[in-house]
């Protein structure tokens, strides 16, 4: 296993791209600190660092829409990670399967899978 200390964190954070393991759809991007990455490796459930709340969070802890991590890949520069996951429910807090549910024109192109008001 790659030593987590050899990764290139910027201000203690590393970018994490989350992708569905089977469909390869990009679900979201978030940041991880070393603790979030360690917890993800240990538990098999995605954990991230909230820059706004300044705290660790387990993806899906409130909604139940967990990300079961099947594989973690490191990019060539060692400054970002790719989580290949089995997504339970939606990844986006707006109710969509992916956070990338709109195109640049503003049109909704993604699948809505839950109503946020029913979950949060």
Curated annotation (Swiss-Prot):
Keyword Methyltransferase among record annotations: no
BP GO terms, sorted: L-histidine biosynthetic process
UniProt key word Metal-binding: yes
Subcellular location field: Cytoplasm
Catalytic activity, EC: 3.5.4.19
Recorded catalytic activity of this chain's protein: 1-(5-phospho-beta-D-ribosyl)-5'-AMP + H2O = 1-(5-phospho-beta-D-ribosyl)-5-[(5-phospho-beta-D-ribosylamino)methylideneamino]imidazole-4-carboxamide
InterPro entries per record: PRA-CH (IPR026660), PRib_AMP_CycHydrolase_dom (IPR002496), PRib_AMP_CycHydrolase_sf (IPR038019)
One cellular-component annotation, GO: cytoplasm
SUPFAM superfamilies: HisI-like
UniProt entry keywords in alphabetical sequence: Amino-acid biosynthesis, Cytoplasm, Histidine biosynthesis, Hydrolase, Magnesium, Metal-binding, Zinc
Binding site for Mg(2+): 75, 77, 79
PANTHER family documented for this protein: HISTIDINE BIOSYNTHESIS BIFUNCTIONAL PROTEIN (PTHR42945), HISTIDINE BIOSYNTHESIS BIFUNCTIONAL PROTEIN HIS7 (PTHR42945:SF1)
UniProt subunit comment: Homodimer.
Family stated for the protein in its record: Belongs to the PRA-CH family.
NCBIfam families attached to this UniProt entry: PRK00051.1
Name of the featured protein: Phosphoribosyl-AMP cyclohydrolase
Phylogenetic classification of the source organism: Archaea, Methanobacteriati, Methanobacteriota, Stenosarchaea group, Methanomicrobia
């Amino acid at each position: 296993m790659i030593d987590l200390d050899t990764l290139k964190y910027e201000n203690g954070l590393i970018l994490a791209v989350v992708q569905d393991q089977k469909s390869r759809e990009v679900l979201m991007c978030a940041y991880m600190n070393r603790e979030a990455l360690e917890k993800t490796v240990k538990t098999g459930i995605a954990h991230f660092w909230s820059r706004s709340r300044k705290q660790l969070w387990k993806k899906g802890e409130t909604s139940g829409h967990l990300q079961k991590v099947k594989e973690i890949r490191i990019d060539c520069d060692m400054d970002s990670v790719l989580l290949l996951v089995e997504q339970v429910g939606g990844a986006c807090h707006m109710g969509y399967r992916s956070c990338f549910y709109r195109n640049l024109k503003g049109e909704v192109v993604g699948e809505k899978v839950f109503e946020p008001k029913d979950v949060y």
